[in-house]
Amino acid sequence: MIEFGNFYQLIAKNHLSHWLETLPAQIAAWQREQQHGLFKQWSNAVEFLPEMTPWRLDLLHSVTAESETPLSEGQLKRIDTLLRNLMPWRKGPFSLYGVDIDTEWRSDWKWDRVLPHLSELTGRTILDVGCGSGYHLWRMIGAGAHLAVGIDPTQLFLCQFEAVRKLLGNDQRAHLLPLGIEQLPALKAFDTVFSMGVLYHRRSPLEHLWQLKDQLVNEGELVLETLVIDGDENTVLVPGDRYAQMRNVYFIPSAPALKKWLEKCGFIDVRIADVCVTTTEEQRRTEWMVTESLADFLDPNDRSKTVEGYPAPQRAVLIARKP
């Protein structure tokens, strides 16, 4: 059974305490609702994992936990089997006592692109919207964050996060809540808010930017990473039925257009920190994610286009500040 009591106790003593006016009731409602058909199987995998305390823990350069002496073949097999019950693993990688989870995405590459452009994270309270398995939450802690809170309604991601947390010694500096951004009140409590890989899935992208702004303290920093296309400040792609085989892609702006959107929503000091094409080395099929990946979504005769004929995925990082 995945519980959230530790998080409630934690925020009861800090500047997030007003969240307790709504959060426990929301989580209780989530627990009462019909869960995914495999949720019991996933939560059992977490429950059956051994409690581990790392002898060496590296969250600064990777997400790596090691024991003082190598685990037995039986212990490794148990951990490996239980973690494979939580496939597909999309965001990572993780190295846990000799079990290496080679995820679909090299999320460490994204972190390496983003980190140099951020304000110092030491001591900060952070929100990561659409955090997936929580890989970047651990990297935020490694970079010095005081508390990293992720939200993502996908139940498999919650179980993946709790599995990793259990193998990291039940670390309480990072937490994942099974909520969407629309379920959060205007907390105005986070020093840094991340939204990475979310904006193009939103029917109303400007509303999403306002929601992110409502979570920030004054002078807080927004880190926005999303799909973009080439063009000027008036260029926006509105795909048809699918983009790179994804049905729920609504708006893909150019980076200059996205900068203009952020300014329209009242953000200041907006800058385009990075733009790069997504490669099949960064997003690919692995033994931990065995279904289709980026290579299957690109035109086999022209890798600069998706199978639908749109420009192939490229992603931008924009940094902005709430006044």
From Swiss-Prot:
GO terms for biological process: tRNA wobble uridine modification. Carboxy-S-adenosyl-L-methionine binds at residues 91, 105, 110, 130, 152-154, 181-182, 196, 200, 315. It catalyses: carboxy-S-adenosyl-L-methionine + 5-hydroxyuridine(34) in tRNA = 5-carboxymethoxyuridine(34) in tRNA + S-adenosyl-L-homocysteine + H(+). One of its GO terms (molecular function) is transferase activity, transferring alkyl or aryl (other than methyl) groups. Its EC number is 2.5.1.-. Keywords: Transferase, tRNA processing. It comes from the Bacteria. It holds the Pfam family Methyltransf_9. SUPFAM superfamilies: S-adenosyl-L-methionine-dependent methyltransferases. Catalyzes carboxymethyl transfer from carboxy-S-adenosyl-L-methionine (Cx-SAM) to 5-hydroxyuridine (ho5U) to form 5-carboxymethoxyuridine (cmo5U) at position 34 in tRNAs. Belongs to the class I-like SAM-binding methyltransferase superfamily. CmoB family. NCBIfam families: PRK15068.1 (NF011650), tRNA 5-methoxyuridine(34)/uridine 5-oxyacetic acid(34) synthase CmoB (TIGR00452). Homotetramer. This is tRNA U34 carboxymethyltransferase. The gene is cmoB.
